[in-house]
Amino acid sequence: VGNPYARGEDSSVQSNMTVTLKDFYADWCGPCKTQDPIIEELEADWEGVEFEKVDVDEHQDVANEYQVRSIPTIVVENDDGVVERFVGVTQRDELEDALQEAGA
């Protein structure tokens, strides 16, 4: 008699969810350059997550849609919408927590 909602059962449902990390940046942004290696490490380790870099100078429409006012801004979302938003340089552990919360 097990719990049907036990973590092992639940993870298969979560793995079907699309999880995306959007990294809003600009080439001239110093803190964005600090953020880059952290994002690159995550991308190498989190195969099931879609990573998108969004240059705010080239894609102002997308930046406006996500209400990006400062960079770097990182948005973690899944099929249900935005799960977490980070403004400024964000450490790997915080981003990993958000990816897990999103269902990755």
Task: Please name every model-derived segment.
Residues 29-32, 74:
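The canonical Cys-X-X-Cys-His
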Residues 17-25:
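Short active-site neighborhood of thiol/selenol oxidoreductases, capturing the structured segment around
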Residues 76-104:
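Non-catalytic, surface beta->alpha helical segment in thiol-disulfide oxidoreductase systems
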Residues 24, 43-60:
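Thiol-based oxidoreductase modules, predominantly thioredoxin-like and allied folds used
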Residues 66-75:
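Structural micro-motif
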Residues 33-46:
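Typically the conserved alpha-helix immediately C-terminal to a functionally engaged Cys/Sec
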Residues 1-16:
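N-terminal amphipathic/basic-hydrophobic helices that include classical n-h-c signal peptides
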